[in-house]
Amino acid sequence: NIGVVQTRWSHINRDYSILTQIQAFALDAHFTLEQVGRNSKNHFMNFNGTAGIWRKTCIIDSGNWQGDTLTEDLDLSYRAQLKKWKFKYLEDVETPSELPIVISAIRSQQFRWNKGGAENFQKMSKNVIHAKNLPLITKVHSILHLLNSTMFLNVFFVGVLSIPMLYIKNEWGHLSLYYDLSSLFIVSTLIFFGCYWVLYRYSKGGGFLNFLEFTKIFFTFYTVAMGFSFHNALAVLEGHIGKKSDFIRTPKFNVLTIKKSLKYNKYTRKKVSKNTIFEGLL
């Protein structure tokens, strides 16, 4: 009773810039780790908005397409799976996609994805918890999946508090035991690093040089994620409190190399917001 077939995104402009490289880096992990894992264990997964096909009867049976969240594909995915429709993920089938290449487009896409995730937690979490004949482990996994974007609240506060914590540690040295215990949280970063390395090695191969290249892109990705944490945290907060906003589409430029100019492209924004400056400082 398959309702959806989802394929893996490939990226036609992966090597356009460092921004497209780290986006591809993160999305590759989503598809090859998260989607493969969820589907293989029969946990709830999400349709990715494109690169797949829906059965019409599945859409209708699940309550049709609804526009009350910014990630309506995630919303419909959960409603369909609560109706016992099956999803099929094809890791070996690549569908070419284009990554956003300018900051304004990346920010609007990230805002939509992260706010939509929070909106869907508010909309779907109770339905998941109270669903009959749904294994407890699947319920737990689904709730954590819906809370995925909420991690940016934690990332933002950790980043902002890191500087005053250095002062506090210096002034209240008698609390050194607590500071030492807090360093255990680095284990989560090491796990994160290890998971991404396994995936990178799977696609690019092992070896010392590949490991060096991976380390460079991983910490670049980590740094940019920290910079985006303020913007994404605002999106998550809006999603949880129910503040509505317009669906802003991600512009496509059909630009595959840095040599092609964007000077006259109507989607290129020249103004830089104050939030963007703050993100750069982060």
Label for each model-derived stretch:
Residues I2-L70, L82, I103-L136, V140-I143, ...:
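Long helical/loop segments within the catalytic core of UDP-sugar-dependent glycosyltransferases
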Residues A24, D28, K86, T95, ...:
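Short, well-ordered loop/turn and helix-capping segments at boundaries between secondary-structure elements
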Residues L70-D75, T220:
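Conserved glycosyltransferase catalytic-site signature
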Residues W85-V102, M124-P135, G159-K169, T220-F230, ...:
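Hydrophobic alpha-helical transmembrane segments
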Residues E98-K115, N210-E213, K244-L262:
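Nucleotide-sugar-dependent glycosyltransferase catalytic core
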Residues A131-N154, N254-L282:
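Loop-to-transmembrane boundary segments
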Residues H145-K252, K274-L282:
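Membrane-embedded multi-pass helical conduit in multi-pass membrane proteins
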